[in-house]
Amino acid sequence: MATRHGRPRRRTLGLIALLALVVAAGAAAWSLRPQPLLPEAQASLGAKPDTAFKKVGESYEWMPPSMHYSVGLIVYPGARVLPAAYGPLAQRIAAHGYLVVVASMPLNLAVLDIDAANAIMAEHPEVTRWAIAGHSLGGAMAAQYVGTHPGVMRGLALWAAYPPGDISTSGVAATSIFGTLDAGADKMASPDTRRELPPDTVFVPIAGGNHEQMGWYTGQPNDPPATISRDDQQGQVAEATLAMLARVQAQPDQFPAPAPSVGPPASPGPPASPVSPASPVPAASGASSPSGA
């Protein structure tokens, strides 16, 4: 039989449990709240003289006004970062003749929809070559997409990110771009990370750059302040990403490229004539400089 004193105690315990639930829900909501956008992000959501713009669902697309393009870039946002934060960067890239689509993610977490690229590609059959980029968690998930969908993506740009697994044999034209002041910079360029990326991956450290300036948002926790402007860092990110897309355009039609055939050794020919040290040897046409990138 419940005593008169027992009922208030149960009521108090119930109120405490309810309060704990409310606090937990509030903490979860706060932790998932997206980072505030900067005005430049909102201003990018529209057409400009050198780029067209379209919103598809909750994702954003930028492209050249001519609508003539064959290479597309899909961007996965960082955790708790809205797609619009990458609008100014997408505009810079699209102005050079590319389709750039910044994907929207459930709860702004790319880990909840790693295959978001599939629906985007299905919407654009005119694109014949695809690359993928991502910032932070979005970059890790972009790399995971490359690993789990072999032969689909031809290029990968990691913006302040590193792969969660080995994609060294994927054949993609890869670049890793990060600020030297980013708290995770050492991991992004570590020997372990390099081993998990294709051997010809291009690493682009941005002196004085940080994590947050990969986009146009603010409030990134535990991020050291940058010593260069956001616009300067964005320009370097765009340049390095465009270099990756140029490599994608230069790839052969067959992708991944077939492994070189191993045949019987060629029969030895006559010995080569010695070259006099005084005789100049003409350079092969189109040969690259030893100091080339």
Which residue stretches match the model-derived regions?
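Short beta-strand/loop motif that positions the catalytic acidic residue
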Residues: 170, 176-178
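The serine-hydrolase catalytic nucleophile loop
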Residues: 81-89, 105, 187-188
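Conserved alpha/beta-hydrolase
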Residues: 90-110
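Gly/Ala-rich beta-loop-alpha elbow adjacent to hydrolase catalytic centers
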Residues: 133-142
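Hydrophobic membrane-insertion alpha-helices, especially the h-region
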Residues: 13-30
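Short beta-strand element of the alpha/beta-hydrolase
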Residues: 69-79
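Active-site-adjacent alpha-helix of alpha/beta-hydrolase-fold enzymes
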Residues: 178-232
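A conserved short beta-strand
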Residues: 151-163, 173
